[in-house]
Amino acid sequence: MKKRRKQYSAGAIIWIIFKYVSLVFFSFVAVIPIISCVITAFKTEEEYKTTNVMTLPQNWFNFDNFVEAFQRANMGRAFVNSVIVMVCVLIGAIIIGTQLAYVLNRFQFPGNGLIRNLFLFAALLPGVAMQVTVYQIMHDLGFINHLYGYIIMMMGTDVISIYIFIQYMENIPVSLDESAIIDGASYWKIYWKIMLPLLKPAIVTACILKGVGVYNEYYSANLYLTKENLKTMAISLYTFTGPLGSQYNLICAGVIISLLPALIVFIVFQKQIYSGIPAGAVKG
């Protein structure tokens, strides 16, 4: 038997067309800045000043901007600093966040709800509003212009990851804990051998959110890391800005250089990323 074609009303057809046109339009809008950045990165300074931003460069093999951006902005050192900060912050955030989530989720004690509400309240506060107090604390502790101080500060402001772990842990049966306790396992062993492996999807989600935020952080890095040898990738791009104008061809080249490591990580770990985010979202 021949299958009947599904009949659509005029309103449904209009709605389908509208959805796809909107999807194409907003995708195009999102891609334009990236295309413009790539085009500008290959232009000479004279080309950039005399042509439209979407005008193609005369020479696609002009890598002078990339070399100059890498050398003048000391992007090699900046990349190392960014990686050190990001890796340390992610490790600290995972250890602190998962342990705190385990305690708040599995143990009922006076003040449990209050602590959760305080974390929620802290998440709602804009980070800029707390910078005066945070800066004073950082200054008094001698953490200004020290990578370890900046790392500690960034680890201490990770509230969203804690809530991701708590919400995911809500779906892990308590019976697993009870069975492990009957078998003689300690709370630490339950956390290390049971909870942490089961939290892998949530950890992937938290690492992506936190990692992108730390790698792209400009305000805090510029405030607490003012020495030249401590600059991160986000700060190094502002080497080409000044009161008399900005060298956007070099800035765009620097942007592409800074994006390459993230792109490589995404390509290598895309399977884990695609499997981790949906699982973390569903469980959360």
Which role fits each region the language model picked out?
Residues 6-11, 15-284:
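A structural signal for multi-pass alpha-helical bundles of membrane permease subunits
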Residues 1-5:
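N-terminal Lys/Arg-rich, disordered targeting/topogenic segments
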